[in-house]
């Protein structure tokens, strides 16, 4: 059972929790199975779920990035070759190349593709499923752009709400999180995108560092405004009955207004440096502090 008072656990996504649960089972069975070989997938899930790259997540990231050899993973190695990449794996590769490709199947209704790809050593299956997923990811990009083209950004700007809540029928539910992230980045405001899903609304949220969207989703659950949901500081998802949409909007806007928040575009720094000291050696030393990610820049 999860200890809700343990803040360490708030940094872990479901994949990480599953990994540690299986690790305990392996220890109980005194098995010699090497679960650490699968840490690459824990890190990919951590990055794609926008979890803070701090504490145990930072330890996992450092170990994986330092030790992982792309040639030992046939699926990732094949995908790298399709893009002509010949370098060591980075956090950006997981977040912007491999992650989106692996996730593309699930977003567009073919979740079995990634399972088949990552659970086989058969080179023919690896080739076919990798190419299929790359094609699906390209299709996802086109669908995503078509959705963005239909959004009235000027209207959203004129409404000037503290939290952007956008509803549209017939958005593919696998894309609402990406659209929410795009709106959040464009307006620098917490953003929620909802669409129809089997006679109920499905929502996905992306937030700014000054507004904990996971806490808001919990409040909405406690108030029975939404049917179910969950999340963390920066992202979350939920389902809600259509007739509760205005209630949701009003509750979130009021909650935001009642909080004393630091500006979302305010960044703190530890010291000032002269431009003259920025050179290759300085950048190399800075990179030694990595890998960098959410809440760790």
Language model region names:
Residues 8-16, 173-178:
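Short, conserved micro-motifs enriched in small and acidic residues
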Residues 26-253, 268, 272-275:
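Hydrophobic helix-and-loop "lid/oligomerization" segment in the mid-to-C-terminal part
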Residues 1-14, 34:
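Hydrophobic, small-residue-rich alpha-helical packing segments that form membrane-like cores
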